[in-house]
């Protein structure tokens, strides 16, 4: 059983994906970390984030251990990853990586921007998690504050809006709702309510897994 979860930044898809993976005993991949890791490799090498050849090389040599680097969670890496993820060669280089993960015996949970549309188009469970830009900005603002990264709410909202536009408008694998995905708007939902809504979808497609 592959559970494909897509959605914009700070929609709650990562929290939900981790909870579903834990509940159903499946491995989980936050595919956004792959793009953050590529961006970090470029920054460490003092290369331009728009250098497609260098970014592709970094993507093709990416090691799973690099996904544990604490720097990947920093706010600046989100913007850097958004730039790198717009490069077609990088998306192509990481596609096999993601598909191999999804092919794990028993299934997997993957979350990102193009899981249900490109990476796992045949996934039996596809969820698209969204929320209003303002609510997503509030969540990210609280998260950053909790990590000791104080930043103005207006700056966080502007970053969310900018990343939404870039994700939706890029030529390679733009963010969109898969035709057979179930949309869950978490604007007014807490994490538990979002989990219950998602689990109901999973169990309708995967009977007996409560």
From Swiss-Prot:
ATP binds at residues 7-15. The keyword tRNA processing does not apply. It is an enzyme of class 2 (transferase). Its main location: cytoplasm. It catalyses: CMP + ATP = CDP + ADP; dCMP + ATP = dCDP + ADP. InterPro entries: Cytidylate_kin, Cytidylate_kinase_dom, P-loop_NTPase. One of its GO terms (biological process) is pyrimidine nucleotide metabolic process. NCBIfam families: cmk. This is Cytidylate kinase. It comes from Methylobacterium sp. (strain 4-46). The gene is cmk.
């Amino acid at each position: 059983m592959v559970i494909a979860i897509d959605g914009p930044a700070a929609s709650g898809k990562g929290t939900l994906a981790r909870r579903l993976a834990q509940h159903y005993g499946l491995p989980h991949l936050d595919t956004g970390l792959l793009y953050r890791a590529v961006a970090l490799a470029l920054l460490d090498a003092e290369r331009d984030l728009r250098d497609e050849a260098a970014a592709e090389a970094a993507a093709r040599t990416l090691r799973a251990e690099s996904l544990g680097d604490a720097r990947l969670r920093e706010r600046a890496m989100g913007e850097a990853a958004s730039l790198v993820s717009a490069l077609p060669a990088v998306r192509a280089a990481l596609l096999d990586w993601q598909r191999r993960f999804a092919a794990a015996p028993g299934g997997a949970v993957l979350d990102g921007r193009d899981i249900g549309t490109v990476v796992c188009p045949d996934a039996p469970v596809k969820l698209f998690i969204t929320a209003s830009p303002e609510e997503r900005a509030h969540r990210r603002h609280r998260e950053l504050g909790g990590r000791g990264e104080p930043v103005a709410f207006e700056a966080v909202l502007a970053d969310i809006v900018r990343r939404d536009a870039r994700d939706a408008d890029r030529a390679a694998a733009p963010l969109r709702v898969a035709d057979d995905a179930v949309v869950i708007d978490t604007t007014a939902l807490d994490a538990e309510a979002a989990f219950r809504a998602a689990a109901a979808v999973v169990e309708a497609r995967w009977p007996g897994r409560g």
